[in-house]
């Protein structure tokens, strides 16, 4: 089973985020393999161990994003692809999906594409579904568990009301939740081996895309630091409690 896993180099979510205008500051900020993508890498590795094949990592970003690819390789993935181009600075989820789709098509045929549900730096959650559309693949989202078989993939899908068990013929795309597995730690041997594993670095030209093809067609209306939550107010009901709660909700524009 040949598996493609999408990975992202994100600012360390354990550190305070900084803004650079209307974008999240990335230059000079410590980055990591996005925690959500670790579950995708682990899912790919478990399927490879069960069915054979290869796991190829795909990422888009500046040169420093190679660190995230190497991290995934140290976990056990076989090779990686990084698409890096100055024209991609500030790319949105739509552009990211378009570029990753072109890279996956160029790299060869894959039985399964795996992605995390959403990244910790953007939380849009739209990229994987858009990627499936560009690739023309069926998609199974929010997988809590998965099981591969010859020619099919079956997942237990988390929903608001419980779980659905769904299956799809391959090739397909799936997104995995944080509860799908326990990502393995990279061993020292794995870290050293990752340095020698092949990583292709492509530009837009290598994908036969131009700067016009990746023009961002949407803009951020505004960005700001979220206000800290204020301490709640305790109301002792002396007969006017309901009215005071109603007034509070009206002030908050809830009702």
What are these regions (language model features)?
Residues 1-255:
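N-terminal glycine-rich FAD/FM-binding segment characteristic of electron-transfer flavoproteins
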């Amino acid at each position: 089973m040949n598996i493609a896993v999408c990975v992202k180099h994100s600012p360390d979510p354990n550190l305070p985020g900084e803004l650079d205008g209307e974008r999240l500051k990335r230059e000079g900020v410590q980055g990591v393999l996005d925690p959500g993508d670790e579950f995708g890498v682990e899912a790919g590795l478990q399927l490879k161990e069960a069915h054979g094949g290869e796991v190829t990592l795909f990422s888009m970003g500046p040169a420093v994003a190679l660190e995230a690819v190497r991290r995934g390789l140290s976990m056990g993935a076989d090779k990686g692809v990084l698409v890096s181009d100055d024209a991609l600075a500030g790319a949105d989820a739509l552009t990211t999906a378009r570029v990753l789709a072109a890279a996956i098509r160029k790299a060869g045929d894959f039985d399964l594409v795996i992605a995390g549900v959403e990244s910790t730096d953007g939380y849009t959650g739209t990229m994987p579904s858009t990627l499936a559309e560009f690739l023309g693949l069926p998609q199974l989202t929010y997988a809590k568990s998965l099981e591969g078989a010859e020619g099919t993939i079956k997942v237990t899908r988390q929903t608001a009301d419980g779980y659905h068990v769904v299956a799809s013929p391959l090739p397909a795309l799936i997104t995995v939740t944080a509860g799908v597995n326990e990502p393995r730690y990279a061993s020292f041997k794995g870290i050293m081996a990752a340095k020698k594993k092949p990583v292709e670095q492509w530009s837009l030209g290598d994908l036969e895309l131009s700067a016009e093809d990746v023009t961002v067609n949407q803009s951020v209306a505004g960005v700001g630091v979220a206000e800290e939550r204020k301490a709640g107010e305790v109301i002792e009901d002396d007969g006017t409690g309901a009215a005071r709660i109603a007034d509070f909700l009206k002030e908050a524009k809830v009702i």
